[in-house]
UniProtKB/Swiss-Prot annotation:
Compartments where located: Cytoplasm
GO cellular component, one term: cytosol
EC number: 5.3.1.9
Active-site residue numbers: 354 (proton donor), 385, 505
Key words, A-Z: Cytoplasm, Gluconeogenesis, Glycolysis, Isomerase
Job of this protein: Catalyzes the reversible isomerization of glucose-6-phosphate to fructose-6-phosphate.
GO MF term set: carbohydrate derivative binding; glucose-6-phosphate isomerase activity; monosaccharide binding
Protein name: Glucose-6-phosphate isomerase
Pathway: Carbohydrate biosynthesis; gluconeogenesis; Carbohydrate degradation; glycolysis; D-glyceraldehyde 3-phosphate and glycerone phosphate from D-glucose: step 2/4
Keyword Acetylation set for record: no
Species classification: Bacteria, Pseudomonadati, Pseudomonadota, Betaproteobacteria, Burkholderiales
Length: 541
């Protein structure tokens, strides 16, 4: 039990002391500059200022002691060693191998995984080059202008986020990459109506090649090709697969030579580094994809070797533990001050909440501490005009991670100065607040003062990068992967399974049959009434 650890109980007592001192007091003291130096880190092209947190040097020391007692170093080493740390599925969780050098000593069950990984990477490079250069053609001999990635969850969120983040690197001449994930037919229909079937390529991305949403969309897209004149024997020019299930790929009609494999020791939310990232290589080129891997590898090396107190993923993870478990803060906000990173919060939602949204420990007993916070956010400055009111003055305190590139894009560089000014100002305002005395001195009407007071003392991290490059983006993603893993270790849960998504899938099958025909199943009264209402509407449609 995490709460049985000595450091956990020491942190409880320490919290009772620290909560009496607001951050404003620490920043008003003579050693404020030293505080910033002490509570900042640089790694893999990222700079972290975590001085605007409710911590002292003693807090940090106790948090690092908790990480030690919880077994973070040992579990980290077990992951890199390829041990079956995904205990409930009896698998390794070796996504770090996907971005490692060919001679890296990564093994699963005693066998090196590196030759297979780098063979797939070689094939991805060749394929991306052929498509992007126009050598790969559709059924009419024309080059590919549009690519549709069909997947869901980890087969969609990661590649979609990266393609959006690196869109400034895409060749304006194409190919353009589109993403379809939802089984709601509107998404696929609206995507396809803009495309030329003769010049479109579909990537069907599913580990098992049985995922309901993905296969429904893939079948509908195959029908779309056939309706628009692509012959059955030419479909192979318009489909490739990313999967572990060769037989299902062949049964669907995709040439097995156009299948890019990955492995069951890669979790979906950790898979963008594998052939699941084929859409990235097609969108921005394989060299950029390779740079993404290099950045992640740099963060892997930092995570594996840096002392805990200088280890960026560990420090960020333990700050999250501090707020979730000792300050009872149930949510956290990701605020990237970069439109390019606007999908990063959605990516983190899956990464953190699917990984650590668990209530059972590794030994099957209930967790005796709160686990994953609700993760939310949008790109700045949009968030300032939506939910920042609550973050500044609401009754719940929300820790915020700000992320910002320092160097402006070539277009409208003056806008970037305004963007950074707002980013830094929000973090300062959260920490500093505004007192009734300040407002009174400024001549504010007495009746308004209570409504304009900012308590301050609200925590945030600031993550900065020079430019949003593939290398730095890779490091940023890997940082949050490892942060998530470390928190799972402390909570003594398995961050690499997702059994919570299974029951809904099982129950959906008979309900689909009921909605489509006359079958009936036993349901609670509410669900039965919903099905009956839907059947009446469907019958009229």
């Amino acid at each position: 039990m995490p709460t049985d650890l000595q450091a956990w109980n020491a942190l409880r007592q320490h919290h009772d002391v620290v909560r009496e001192t607001p951050m404003q007091q620490w920043f008003a003291e003579a050693g404020a500059a030293q505080r910033v130096d002490a509570f900042s880190l640089e790694a893999s092209g990222l700079y972290l200022d975590y001085s605007k947190n409710r911590i002292t040097g003693e807090t940090l020391a106790l948090l690092m002691k908790l990480a030690e007692e919880a077994g973070v170093p040992a579990r980290r080493d077990a992951m890199f060693a390829g041990e079956h740390i995904n205990a409930t599925e009896d698998r390794a969780a070796l996504h770090v191998a996907l971005r490692a050098l060919p001679d890296a000593p990564f093994k699963v069950d005693g066998a090196s995984v590196m030759p297979a990984i780098h063979d797939v990477l070689r094939r991805m490079r060749e394929f991306a080059g052929r498509v992007r250069s126009g050598v790969w053609t559709g059924s009419t001999g024309q080059g590919i202008t549009d690519i549709v990635n069909i997947g869901i969850g980890g087969s969609d969120l990661g590649p979609r986020m990266v393609c959006r983040a690196l869109a400034h690197l895409a060749d304006p001449r194409g190919p353009r990459v589109h993403f379809v994930s939802n089984v709601d037919g509107t998404e696929l229909a609206e995507t396809l109506q803009r495309l030329d079937p003769a010049r479109t390529l579909a990537i069907v991305c599913s580990k098992t090649f049985t995922t309901l949403e993905t296969m429904a969309n893939a079948c509908s897209m195959r029908d779309w090709f056939l309706r628009h004149g692509v012959a059955e024997n030419q479909l192979a020019r318009h489909f490739v697969a990313v999967s572990t299930n060769r037989d299902a790929v062949v049964d669907f009609g995709i040439d097995p030579n156009n299948m890019f494999e990955f492995w069951d020791w890669i979790g979906g939310r950790f898979s963008l580094w594998s052939s699941v990232g084929l859409s990235i290589a097609l969108a921005v080129g394989f060299d950029a994809f390779e740079d993404l891997l290099l950045g992640a590898r740099a963060m892997d090396d930092h995570f594996r070797t840096a002392p805990l107190a200088q280890n960026m993923p560990v420090v960020m993870a333990m700050l999250g533990i501090w707020y979730r478990n000792f300050h009872d803060m149930p949510t956290s906000c990701m605020a990237p001050y970069s439109t390019s990173l606007e999908l990063f919060p959605a990516f983190l939602q899956q990464l953190e909440m699917e990984s650590n949204g668990k209530s059972v420990q590794l030994d099957g007993r209930p967790v005796d501490a709160d686990t994953a916070p609700v993760v939310w956010g949008t790109a700045g400055t949009n968030g300032q005009h939506a939910y920042f009111q609550m973050i500044h003055q609401g009754s719940q305190i929300v820790p915020v991670d700000f992320v910002a590139p320092l160097v402006p894009p070539r277009e409208l560089p003056g806008h970037h100065v305004k963007l950074l000014a707002n980013c830094f100002a929000q973090a300062e305002a959260l920490m500093r607040g505004r007192s009734a005395e300040e407002l009174q001195a400024a001549g504010v009407d007495a009746a308004r003062i209570p409504h304009m007071v900012f308590e301050g003392n609200r925590p945030s991290n600031m993550l900065l990068m020079e430019n949003l490059t593939p290398h730095v983006l890779g490091a940023l993603i890997a940082l949050y992967e490892h942060r998530t893993f470390v928190q799972g270790i402390v909570w003594n849960i398995n961050s690499f399974d997702q059994w919570g998504v299974e029951l809904g899938k099982i129950l959906a099958r008979p309900i689909e049959a009921e909605l489509s025909g006359n079958a009936t199943e036993a349901h609670d009264a509410s669900t039965a009434a919903l099905i009956a209402r839907a059947r009446r509407s469907l019958a009229r449609s």
